[in-house]
Structure formats: C-alpha cells, structure tokens
C-alpha cells in the first residue's frame, strides 16, 4: 500500500463522523506495521475512527482523518494505544499501557482458544476419563476470567466452559460438562491450567429447537405482509438520515456497535439539537449461583468482548420487515486484516398503533392519527445469548432505547433429582440454568437546544396543606454536582429525571427539557463487597451525570477485562464532583433484567424487552404532531379506506 495515497484512504468518506472505511482501516494498519508495530508478535484489537472534537465539528473547520488503534504485543505481554494520521501517514501517538491492562478479546482469539483446548493432551486425557473421546463433538466456549483476587498481571487469559453434542446440530447447552474449566493464555499460546473437579454426570436429555427436531410447523397463521408501495419515508445520504422531523448520523464501532450522532428535531423549520452522541456504553451479566463454575460468570459483553464485532449480518424478512436500509460495519481481525459485517445495522419504519385520538360525543365526530416509528437496530450474538439493540424515534419527539434479549440460556449440570435453589431445573436429567441479571448502561451526550444543560430529579410529593388527602405534586430538585447526581430509581415516588436548558425557554417561560422515564431500573443484586460489584459499580446506581470529558467513554472504564475496578469508570470520574449545572454534560442510565429463569425459556428463549424512554417535557409549545394527515390505510384493492379495512 502507498502510504501517501490520501485520495485512496478517503474513499467513501463524506463527513468527519463517518466510520472508517475498509481502505482507511487497511491504511492505518499498514502505517503501524511500517512503524512501531512491525514485529510479528503484535495483534490488533481495534482500529476505529478517532472522532473530531466537538468544538471542531461545531466550527466546521477541516479536520484530519485519524484512527485510534489498540494493540497487544504478545512477546512483551503488553498493550498499546496508537493515534494514526491517515492523511499524513504518520503515527502521532504511541502509548504503552500499564502492565495490568488487558484490552477486549478478538473473534479469532476465541477460535484460537477453542482450537488449543481441543488439542491439549491434558484436556484430552481428562475428558477421556469422563468417557468423552470424540473431540469433534466437544464444544469449548471461551469466557473472560474476570477478577477474583488473583495475580494475573501480564497474562491474557480466557477460561473455556465445556459442553458436548450428541451430533453435529445438537444443542451443546443441553449437555454441560460441569466442574471442568480450561484456562488458556493468549500471550503464551498455551493451556496454563485445567480445573477438573467433582464429576457430575453430563445431562443426556436433548434441548433442540431446529425444525428437523421439533417436527412440522403450524399452518394456521395467515400471511402478514408489510407493504410500502411508495417506499420508505426516510432519506439517506451516506451515513446521514432524515425522517419526518428527525435527522441524525449513523455510526458503528467495534466496542459499541450502533452509534447515533447529532440527533436533531426540526421544529417550526428549525433543526433543534437533542443528543450529540448516544450508544451502549457497557453491559454486564452477573450470575447468582454459588456453584464453583457458575459463581465466576460475569461477562462484560461490551468491554471484554467488543460487542460491535459480534453483530450479525441481518436479513430481510427475519430480522427486519418492510422497506429496509442497511449499513455495513467495518472492523479488523487480530492480524490487521480489515473485514466487513454486511448489513450490520438495519433501519426501517414500523406502524405504532394510535398516536392520538378524540371522539367528540357532542358533534359525533372523531379524529385519529396513527403513530409510526423509525427503527435503527443491530443484533449481536455473544456465545449463547442474542441481544438485539434498538433505537426508536417517534413522530412526537420521543426516543426509546430497547434491548430484546433472546438466544439460549447459559446452563449448568447438577445431580439428577437435585433442585438447585439458585436456578431453575430444565428437565429431570440434571440440567438447570442459574439465576442471573442483564445490566446495561447507555451513554447520552446531551445537547438540548445547545451545549449548556442541567439535570433535575422529579419526585411526587404530598403538600402540607392537603385537607382532602388527595393532593400530590411533582417537585423538581436540581442536581448540582456529579456526586449529587448518583441516583437510584424510586417507583414509590414516581421518579424521573429531566434534562433541561435554562437558556432556552418555552411558551410559558420554563426551560425546555426532555425527561428520562426510568423503566427497568434495577440495580446489581450482588453484595457491594463482591468482586463483580467493585468492577461493575456503574450498575449499583441507575443515574450518573458527568461533566463532558472525551476520554470518559465507557461506564466500567476503558479496559474492564481482568480489571479490579479500582482505577477507572464512572465511580472514579465522579469523585471529582464537578459542576453539572449549565454546562456540557453526559447522562448515563443503567437498567436491566432480573432473570429468574422459567421452563418456557428453554430450549430457546422467547424475546424479553428491556429499555427506557426519553420524552419531550416542555421542549415544544404544544403537541408537535397536529400536522399529521388523517389516518387511512390502503385496502388490498388499492383503494383508500378510512382508518382500516373491515369485514361487515
């Protein structure tokens, strides 16, 4: 590659926030390999856009295309960060990270671990003692090792849970090999430890969901077709999208997956900024079982596994319905080869029932307007689980973030007839699934009508003068500093939070605002002194608000893999107790699912919805959807019908 081929490096780039193209990723890798990362022992963890500063973007000044890269040198067992100027062909920054830092794993590292486990003589011999000799049917599932007080400094470790199939398509999660864990050091390139404890019989009953196992599909459901004869209502130019009154830019990173930039709403002809940047910041799945293997399950699927790299290539008719626009995601493998997840992001419209309606009984007339939403989504497979992440934009200015959890339970083995109190038995053959949580944190860099924002907590309170006992009111309390803004949900007080702009007033001279409706606002169940609680302190509270700092990107810190939690993350940054009134601020919301497993979750789990809403709260002077046309639909004959088609 020619390192000064500026025009080639910028192929497909039309805006400073556009994700790196494959050409740009290859160029960044080539620059690094001709510079400080020339040794064969280097592995690439990520190469992504170094986003320009917000000041430069607002000023509209020309900015160089730069890449942020994270690498591991296996020979040194050390990690590095680099900043590459793609136009100049230079490495502008090369930083050696602390010895205890381990970046996220790469997909090909998972394959490397599984292959090494399958070939290790000690593992083969131990499995043979358990009667398992056909290694082709044994599945090694690499997990992060977390941190439980061990000194693993300089070791880049995975621990493989082990399952077995009856045949090629059989679900391995029906047959866990309990109390059998293989530890693999990626830097050393070898299995370093095998934990082979009390042998529990491998459950033999199957748990399959493929059509060839479950029999004929039902035939009584009639086709339900989604048709848009005039096409979709959105317009896409590169990564820029306009739909109804909304406009935004679509981004993608290996760590976060889908990112929304520069989210604006057109009000009376004016594009009003709402959120500058929004994305999944972190997630953790802690298990509540005390069994030796299960007690150490607590995956940080974003910070340890780069959940964006695990995005599926989405397909029409299965993952998305309607008139679809897809966006690809570009990343890099550990050897520096660019690769593309085709159709990583899906965008489409959905009908959303009624938006507003009123029947005037005096006049005998009715007005109804139907709602629709724009759906921007990606779906990631993290070993056994699928997480589908959705941003929903509504016509009235509301925003929803939704996670749809599905896939297969992470299972465990017990003696046949046992009833583990920390999980749900899935059959009478010794298979169970432990209780666990799915905790998510979303980072929202607000820019509500401008940079200077503030946050209020709103609780229901009873006034002192309440002679009838029926009076109650909503009381605002300004959250002035970062420490005061570390908050939990409170359903008894009907609590929500408002993001406001004191310099922008509405019709009744109140600051314009959006409110965060804290649905699914659970907290981490583990005790505060548990290792997972120390590492996932973001999940001990629901709301965090920080003064903007471009280096503070992820709720559990930049590198949670094997980290203690003592050095980085929201709980560290907020110790500064910075002012968050009338300043550039970031809102972080933690929510989740307390997953008490049920039989109906097996052998594949029906979707569970987890999320929250953002709603305009005095941001507009009235309902912004009064200009919607009367709701009609088109019948199968192509004729417009009032509201709906009926059979009389």
From Swiss-Prot:
Binding residues annotated for Cu cation, in chain numbering: 436, 438, 595
InterPro entries tied to this protein: AGAO-like_N2, Cu_Am_Ox_Cu-bd, Cu_Am_ox_TPQ-bd, Cu_amine_oxidase, Cu_amine_oxidase_C, Cu_amine_oxidase_C_sf, Cu_amine_oxidase_N-reg, Cu_amine_oxidase_N3
Gene3D superfamilies: 3.10.450.40, Copper amine oxidase, catalytic domain (2.70.98.20)
Protein name according to UniProt: Copper methylamine oxidase
Record keywords: Copper, Disulfide bond, Manganese, Metal-binding, Oxidoreductase, TPQ
Cofactor names: Cu cation; Zn(2+); L-topaquinone; Mn(2+)
Signal peptide segment: none
Induction: By methylamine.
Similarity section: Belongs to the copper/topaquinone oxidase family.
Listed PROSITE patterns: COPPER_AMINE_OXID_1, COPPER_AMINE_OXID_2
Residue ranges, annotated region (Disordered): 629-648
UniProt cofactor note: Binds 1 copper ion per subunit. Can also use zinc ion as cofactor. Contains 1 topaquinone per subunit.
Positions of the propeptide removed during maturation: 1-9
Enzyme Commission identifier(s): 1.4.3.21
UniProt record, GO biological process: amine metabolic process
